[in-house]
Amino acid sequence: MAEPVHFDPFEEDALADPGAAYGALRAACPFHHQPAQAGRPDYYVLSDHAEIKTDVLQGGPIWSFRFGNAMKDSISDVGFKTDGAFHAAFRMVVQRGLTPSAVKAWRPKIEAIVDELVEAMLAIPEGRGDFYSLFALPLPARMMCLMLGAPEADYQNYKRWSDTLQFLTFEDPEPGSYETVLREIYPHFTTLIEQRQALLVAAGVDEPDLSHLGTVLPDDFMSRALVSRVEDRRLTHEEMLNICLAFLTGGQETTTNLIGHLLRRLLEAPERWEQLKANPSLIDNAVEESLRFDPPVLAHFRTSLSETRLHDHDIPERAKLMFSICGANRDPAVFEDPDEFRIDRPLPEARQHLSFGSGVHLCLGAPVARLEAKIALERLIERLPNLRLLGVGGRVRTWMYWGHTGLDVAWN
């Protein structure tokens, strides 16, 4: 281990400029031991891109997700927060609905929402406003509702629930506060599940399967959870709620931050915006570069299931490891000029980022997030070519998420 360095993800410098803080830690000490402090447990921080990808994310069962992806343990044997064969089978329930052709089929709906949001912006007489509230927030939130099968009109409630759950997961809440929120959310999802069960009863279907999607049942992921089988059995009610929660918390904030960061970086250096307008073929490059340079999630945690070695150091059982996505995405061994935002960075290089993870816990919603960001840029450069950045709002309150509360822009 290198010479001890000071690092605290809760300090103002790290919160305000995570790229600089996490990059400096990687450069000085790619494997760092963070002692316990302020009621937080001790943990290790790994910032080396190759080791994170090979030894942790693709390294087999040693580094477990079962104790949660936050600093403090959140033990679960349900759904996505598991490992091994059951986890693979459970993921497949959702993955079957996110094939390339299935994701492509969502394009018209994404385009319709984007067009509606752009029209609403153009109707504002002042020609300026907060890009987050007008566009970056409602687009992924409404799409999440449609994909899950929840009422699209309720997207603001879903956003509020998502923000609250993320804060309570990654910060230091009062005991029982997480459960209090779930007591508001679970009855809502249970009602939607029961509505689908009633449709099956009305149609006389005793053994539903995937063929009933789009016929007896709406073709959405809540229905998919209801008719799918894992290890030759139906999903339990708790497992179905787990899928609903995964969509609620995973399908909004990260994509909002992706779209917000992307536009901010393009507008803060107007020559980038002009470059993209002149060459729209760089849209995919710009999306991947944004994911690399400004990862919506700065880091995740894993827990060691047994004694192991990492970065030539002995690691005890049940040790907490924070793998720094933000630090790895600035690794000069992988990315040329890693501290520069370049929309013409070659795609094969830019796509080496770890912002969606890798291995068995690779983000299932990554193709949808990419598509939403791509369509957003396509429409913005076409319909709002004179976009200008006026100001950047405050930082989101959850330290593991990198995003802002607003982006003041003008388009006249």
Where are these regions (language model features)?
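Cytochrome P450
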Residues: M1-N412
